[in-house]
From Swiss-Prot:
Source organism per UniProt: Equus asinus (Donkey)
Molecular-function GO terms, alphabetical: electron transfer activity; heme binding; metal ion binding
Keywords, comma-separated and alphabetical: Acetylation, Apoptosis, Electron transport, Heme, Iron, Metal-binding, Mitochondrion, Phosphoprotein, Respiratory chain, Transport
InterPro entries recorded: Cyt_c-like_dom, Cyt_c-like_dom_sf, Cyt_c_1A/1B
PANTHER family for this protein: CYTOCHROME C
Modified residues (N6-succinyllysine): 56, 73
PROSITE patterns in the cross-refs: CYTC
Sites of N-acetylglycine modification: 2
Function per UniProt: Electron carrier protein. The oxidized form of the cytochrome c heme group can accept an electron from the heme group of the cytochrome c1 subunit of cytochrome reductase. Cytochrome c then transfers this electron to the cytochrome oxidase complex, the final protein carrier in the mitochondrial electron-transport chain. Plays a role in apoptosis. Suppression of the anti-apoptotic members or activation of the pro-apoptotic members of the Bcl-2 family leads to altered mitochondrial membrane permeability resulting in release of cytochrome c into the cytosol. Binding of cytochrome c to Apaf-1 triggers the activation of caspase-9, which then accelerates apoptosis by activating other caspases.
Mod. after translation: Binds 1 heme c group covalently per subunit.
Protein name: Cytochrome c
Other remarks on this protein: Mules and hinnies are heterozygous, having equal amount of horse and donkey cytochromes c.
């Protein structure tokens, strides 16, 4: 899969403005991502999601994140995530490797 250290840099540059990853981390514009893998869309406790996110009904794992992070608004039309996506597959792989580690510590 990807490189965790490179993924951490991508997270800091592109995601940390709106998301936290640590256990007990607060929600920002986007939800805290701790425990992301294996959780269904729209399920972080205490975060106000759009119906689109709540109703998508998929479980977050490597494959679903690869598709979502490429083009979030295409994958979940109606999401309030205003991020355009990451077109480079290797960057998505690195970010997912980092998320897999950081959201499970």
């Amino acid at each position: 899969m990807g490189d965790v250290e490179k993924g951490k840099k991508i997270f800091v540059q592109k995601c940390a403005q709106c998301h936290t990853v640590e256990k007990g981390g607060k929600h920002k514009t986007g939800p805290n991502l701790h425990g992301l893998f294996g959780r269904k869309t729209g399920q972080a406790p205490g975060f106000s999601y759009t119906d689109a996110n709540k109703n998508k009904g998929i479980t977050w794992k490597e494959e679903t994140l690869m598709e979502y992070l490429e083009n979030p608004k295409k994958y979940i039309p109606g999401t309030k995530m205003i991020f355009a996506g990451i077109k480079k597959k290797t960057e998505r792989e690195d970010l997912i490797a980092y998320l897999k580690k950081a959201t499970n510590e």
